[in-house]
């Protein structure tokens, strides 16, 4: 992959035997994260339940980058399973395991098995800003119109 940045990754013992996250098409934006739950005890999410799902993955993002953990559209569309804190942010200085907070918004229990692709991780540059106090702000045609103010 030309222009790719290198990210060092480690797998914890409970992820042994699982492949590193990978892109599953040539134009995919996200690397698929897999569940590192025990083979013998899959995780069952009842309808309305949420759980932290381990991936067994630790990464060292370069300065100026972040990773976002986002839902997989197929899980959401077919089963109502999504990432509860979407997008979950992984900061460049974080060196702990990446876990995925999944919620089952569907009507039936959903079983998460070892190695199942449960979320996608997008790595992107971060723009840092410096906020400055201001007495007034420039006017816009939208003004303070918020949720739904621009129509359907």
Swiss-Prot record:
EC number: 3.6.1.23
Record family assignment: Belongs to the dUTPase family.
Function: This enzyme is involved in nucleotide metabolism: it produces dUMP, the immediate precursor of thymidine nucleotides and it decreases the intracellular concentration of dUTP so that uracil cannot be incorporated into DNA.
Catalyzed reaction equations: dUTP + H2O = dUMP + diphosphate + H(+)
Organism per entry: Nitrobacter hamburgensis (strain DSM 10229 / NCIMB 13809 / X14)
The protein's annotated pathway: Pyrimidine metabolism; dUMP biosynthesis; dUMP from dCTP (dUTP route): step 2/2
GO biological process: dUMP biosynthetic process; dUTP catabolic process
Residues that coordinate or bind substrate: 72-74, 85, 89-91
Gene Ontology MF terms: dUTP diphosphatase activity; magnesium ion binding
Uppermost EC category: hydrolase
Necessary cofactors: Mg(2+)
Protein name: Deoxyuridine 5'-triphosphate nucleotidohydrolase
Keyword Transferase: no
Lineage: Bacteria, Pseudomonadati, Pseudomonadota, Alphaproteobacteria, Hyphomicrobiales
Keywords for this protein: Hydrolase, Magnesium, Metal-binding, Nucleotide metabolism
């Amino acid at each position: 992959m030309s222009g790719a940045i290198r990210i060092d990754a480690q797998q914890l013992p409970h992820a042994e035997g699982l492949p590193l996250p990978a892109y599953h098409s040539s134009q995919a934006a996200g690397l698929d994260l897999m569940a590192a739950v025990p083979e013998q005890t899959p995780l069952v999410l009842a309808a309305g339940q949420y759980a932290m799902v381990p991936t067994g993955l630790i990464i060292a993002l370069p300065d100026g980058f972040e990773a976002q953990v986002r839902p997989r559209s197929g899980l959401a569309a077919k089963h109502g399973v999504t990432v509860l804190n979407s997008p979950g942010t992984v900061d460049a200085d974080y060196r702990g395991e990446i876990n995925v907070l999944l919620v089952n918004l569907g009507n039936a229990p959903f079983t998460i098995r070892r190695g199942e692709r449960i979320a996608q991780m997008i790595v992107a540059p971060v723009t840092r800003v410096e906020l400055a106090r201001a007495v007034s702000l420039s006017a816009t045609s939208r003004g303070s119109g918020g949720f739904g103010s621009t129509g359907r």
